[in-house]
A protein has these predicted regions:
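Active-site-adjacent loop and "lid" segments of alpha/beta metabolic enzymes
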Residues: 48-54, 165-186, 221-224, 228-242, ...
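Phosphate-interacting basic helix/loop segments used at nucleotide- and nucleic-acid interfaces
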Residues: 1-15, 81, 105-107, 243-257
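Long, charged amphipathic helices and adjacent flexible linkers at domain junctions
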Residues: 41, 50, 85, 102-105, ...
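Beta-strand/loop-dominated core regions that host nucleotide or nucleotide-derived cofactor-binding catalytic loops
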Residues: 1-62
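Conserved alpha/beta-domain cores
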Residues: 47, 52-162, 168-179
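Generic secondary-structure signature for well-ordered alpha-helical cores
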Residues: 67, 89-96, 119-123, 148-156, ...
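Single conserved hydrophobic/aromatic residue that forms the stacking wall/gate
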Residues: 276-287
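Glycine-rich phosphate-binding active-site loops on the catalytic face of alpha/beta enzymes
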Residues: 126-135, 182-205
Length: 287
C-alpha cells in the first residue's frame, strides 16, 4: 500500500483513499461513504498481495469437502497455476483426488496468468463482482469474452457469475440490461450462468432462478451453434478424448444426425461432448 492508493469495501460501494501508513496502521480518507454490513469483501486494486493462497480455514474447508463427498471446490482469487496445484495437492493427500477445482478469476493477476490457470484447473469461473472492483469496469466485458473463448477452446467448463440479475435481490423482475447480460454470456459460449446474492439473500430467489432459466432456454433456441462451432478455433494440442469429441461433432453436423450417443466408461467422453456447443443433443450410455 502507498499513500494515494484506494481500499474498496463491499464491491466498491465504500471507497477509502490512503492518506498515511504508520506501521500496521493505515489512515484513510472516506471518498464514498456507506454502511458496511457483515462479512463484506475488501479489495485493494493493483496491489500484488504476497500472502499464502490457502489459509488455515481454507485447509479445514477442503477437508470438510472431502469428508462430505463434494464434486467441486472453487478457488477464490486464483492468481497463478501454482494456487491450483496447491489446492490439488491437499485434495490428493487426503483422498479427494476426484474432486474437481474451479478457478475463480477475480483480479488482474488471474487475468494475466489465465492461460496457465486454464491448463491447471478443471474449470473457470469469471467472478465479475470482485473483478469489476479490482479492474476498471469497462475492461470486464472484453475480459469475459476472451476468457470464455479460451476456456471453450481448451474443452473445459466456464461459469459466468455475479450480479447477473442483481436487481432481483429486491425486485420481482430484472432490468432489461440484466436480461441482456445473461443472454450475451450465453451467446459468447459460457457453459453456465450463476446466481449469487439473488438466491442467497434476495427476496425473490425462485423467481430469479426461473427468469435466468427462461432467458437461457430462449437464447439456446435462437443460436446457430453449428455455425459457431465450425468457425471456432480448435485446441492446438488436443488430447485423444478432445480430438474424438471434435470429430464426432463435425460428423454429426455433416450427417444432420438427430443425436449423438456416447458409450463411455468413465463419463469423460460424454462430458467433453456436452462442452462442445452444437445443436444435436448428446446422450450418455455407460458400459
Amino acid at each position: 500500500m502507498q499513500p494515494g492508493g484506494h481500499i474498496l469495501v463491499d464491491d466498491g460501494l465504500v471507497d477509502l483513499e490512503v492518506q498515511d501508513i504508520a506501521g500496521k496502521d493505515i489512515v484513510c480518507k472516506v471518498i464514498n461513504a456507506g454502511v458496511i454490513g457483515d462479512r463484506k469483501g475488501v479489495n485493494v486494486p493493483g496491489a500484488n498481495l504476497k500472502m499464502p493462497f490457502i489459509s488455515k480455514k481454507d485447509h479445514g474447508d477442503l477437508l470438510f469437502g472431502i469428508q462430505e463427498g463434494f464434486d467441486f471446490v472453487a478457488a477464490s482469487f486464483t492468481r497463478t497455476a501454482n494456487d491450483i496445484r496447491e489446492v490439488r495437492k491437499i485434495l490428493k493427500e487426503n483422498g479427494g483426488e476426484e474432486i474437481q477445482i474451479i478457478a475463480k478469476i477475480e483480479n488482474q493477476q488471474g487475468v494475466d496468468n489465465i492461460d496457465e490457470i486454464i491448463e491447471a484447473a478443471d474449470g473457470i469461473m469469471i467472478a465479475r463482482g470482485d473483478m469489476g472492483v479490482e479492474i476498471p469496469p469497462e475492461y470486464v466485458p472484453v475480459i469475459q469474452q476472451k476468457i470464455i473463448q479460451k476456456v471453450y477452446t481448451a474443452g473445459k467448463p466456464v461459469i459466468t457469475a455475479t450480479q447477473m440479475l442483481d436487481s432481483m435481490i429486491s425486485h420481482p423482475r430484472p432490468t432489461r440490461a440484466e436480461a441482456t447480460d445473461v443472454a450475451n454470456a450465453i451467446f459468447q459460449g459460457t457453459s453456465a450462468t450463476m446466481l449469487s446474492g439473488e438466491t442467497a439473500a434476495g427476496k425473490y430467489p425462485v423467481q430469479a432462478l426461473q427468469m435466468m432459466s427462461r432467458i437461457a432456454e430462449h437464447m439456446e433456441q435462437n443460436i446457430d451453434y453449428n455455425t459457431i462451432f465450425k468457425k471456432t478455433d480448435r485446441n492446438e494440442n488436443p488430447d485423444i478424448t478432445n480430438a474424438i469429441a471434435h470429430a464426432t461433432c463435425l460428423t454429426a453436423i455433416d450427417l444432420k444426425a438427430s443425436a449423438i450417443l456416447a458409450v463411455t466408461k468413465s463419463g469423460s467422453t460424454a462430458h467433453m461432448l456436452s462442452l462442445i456447443h452444437i445443436s444435436e443433443p448428446t446422450r450418455r450410455r455407460g458400459i
